[in-house]
């Protein structure tokens, strides 16, 4: 009786964790579509700040660099998620293999978040000082909307 209950609890916990990881990955893909290189933050920046040609050129280069970096990290995230799925398929309970695969997913997701923030601040540095306040407002507004 106790073993069966413990097993059900373990499986339920594992399924819940897997659903959480999958939801996080879906969120990453929805917010970082590879088909559209410009994020909504990028578009809002163009609407809020009158960029000159030099700023546009600088930001476009930074955007291209970030797109390549983001794709590399997203590839690692997909691979890590695949490892997690394989680990669970081999042994559908919390195990050292599932733990390690979960940590790989977490590392890749954290790397993506960090790279995105570095990119945001690199973009800001590419603006004229008089345009940075408007950029900051757009950034803060976007983050606030995302947290609601």
From Swiss-Prot:
Keywords: Cadmium, Cadmium resistance, Cobalt, Nickel, Plasmid
Pfam families: Metal_resist
Lineage of producing organism: Bacteria, Pseudomonadati, Pseudomonadota, Betaproteobacteria, Burkholderiales
Function summary: Component of the NCC cation-efflux system that confers resistance to nickel, cobalt and cadmium. May be involved in the regulation of NCC.
Signal peptide as annotated in the record: none
Organism for this UniProt entry: Alcaligenes xylosoxydans xylosoxydans
Entry-linked InterPro entries: Metal_resist
The keyword Lipid biosynthesis belongs to this UniProt entry's keyword annotation: no
Family: To A.eutrophus CnrR.
Name this protein carries in UniProt: Nickel-cobalt-cadmium resistance protein NccX
Source superkingdom: Bacteria
GO biological process: response to cadmium ion
